[in-house]
């Protein structure tokens, strides 16, 4: 699974880790992250992420 990076702040979404503090379980591919999920650092929408 590919990692994705927030183009606003540089936060890296790692599918192996997910974002459990915000309801995304480890092992969740970026494509399967809910559409309303936002960057946990800066609040940017999912659309601001690109493949690492």
Swiss-Prot record:
The gene is rub. Its cofactor is Fe(3+). It is found in: Cytoplasm. Signal peptide: none annotated. It comes from Nitratidesulfovibrio vulgaris (strain DSM 19637 / Miyazaki F). Fe cation binds at residues 6, 9, 39, 42. Keywords: Cytoplasm, Electron transport, Formylation, Iron, Metal-binding, Transport. The keyword RNA-binding does not apply. The lineage of its organism: Bacteria, Pseudomonadati, Thermodesulfobacteriota, Desulfovibrionia, Desulfovibrionales. GO terms for molecular function: electron transfer activity; iron ion binding. GO terms for biological process: alkane catabolic process. This is Rubredoxin. Rubredoxin is a small nonheme, iron protein lacking acid-labile sulfide. Its single Fe, chelated to 4 Cys, functions as an electron acceptor and may also stabilize the conformation of the molecule. The modification N-formylmethionine is found at residue 1. Belongs to the rubredoxin family.
